Amino acid sequence: MSFIDEVKIHVKSGDGGPGCVSFRHEKFIEFGGPDGGDGGKGGNVIVEASRNLSTLLDLRQHPHQKAGSGKNGMGKDRHGAYGKDLRLLLPVGTVIKDAETDEVLADLTEPGQPLVLLKGGRGGQGNARFATATHKAPRFAQPGEPGEERWLRLELKLMADVGLLGMPSVGKSSLITKVSAARPKIAEYHFTTLKPNLGVVAYKNYKSFVMADIPGLIEGAHEGAGLGHRFLKHLERTGHLLHILDISWMPDRDPIREYEAINKELSLFNPELAEKKQTIVINKMDLPVVKENLAKVLPYFQERGLKVFPISAATGEGIPALLDEIARQLWGAAEEEW
């Protein structure tokens, strides 16, 4: 199962309509002059970001998109109607690239702001345009110009304030379920989360932030292991990272080693990712073994000046304090400090 964050589509602007060859035919005028009108301009291809969309699924199902062509010119100097624009609404955060050259054509970081990606072809001129003193009855007109066409690759990077980072099955999906309206699929096996999930977390005083439940990473993710390339790409625009650890498996699994392995993957994929601020979250505090193991891992993080928040995504223990810390990271202060 793949998640929809990249799609290749073909877009074409509208062709211009052909000009018209026509002559006046009126009572008592035996040899009327040329009156062929111009063809209409083809429709443009326009892209615009919208917060109402969160995936590229619709374009994956309909990869060929075309604007309307201009209508034919007509007699009596009537111009053809313009072709209808093709307006593509895309999720905020979509990067548009030329599929052949990999050139970035647009980076839709804000909603609105429509951008003309391909211009429609010009309409052809009618024969009325070609009449001269020496050539009063031109019997030709221009064809319309063809529209532009292009193969595009659309990449969607999540626009989230907070990203949940960690090995598979450490409780990221459980946490985002607890604090937001998101309902990701949850089960006790690796790679349950097969696509990034977004949840809106309602904080105090009507404030909110977006949390991204990024699928679990494994060693070799920067080389694509476990779909790692796609997963890591979603972290690039996340403002703050929560690094979730499960210490219930000690000593069979070493959470410190897992923490270091993931940070190594971040650095190998993009050094700037490894520099992002992280808050350490120890999950599953409702289990007695986790309370016993907490003292064994705390010194490692304290020595590195990292804040550690013990929580239980199952019971809600410690989550209010964690949300206050997120608020401090995002806005500079928790609600009660304002």
Curated annotation (Swiss-Prot):
Gene3D superfamilies: GTP1/OBG domain, P-loop containing nucleotide triphosphate hydrolases
UniProt: GTP binding residues: 166-173, 191-195, 213-216, 283-286, 312-314
Keyword Chaperone applies: no
Domain Obg residue range list: 1-159
Family: Belongs to the TRAFAC class OBG-HflX-like GTPase superfamily. OBG GTPase family.
Alphabetical list of NCBIfam families matching this protein: Obg_CgtA, PRK12296.1, PRK12297.1, PRK12299.1
Protein name as it appears in the record: GTPase Obg
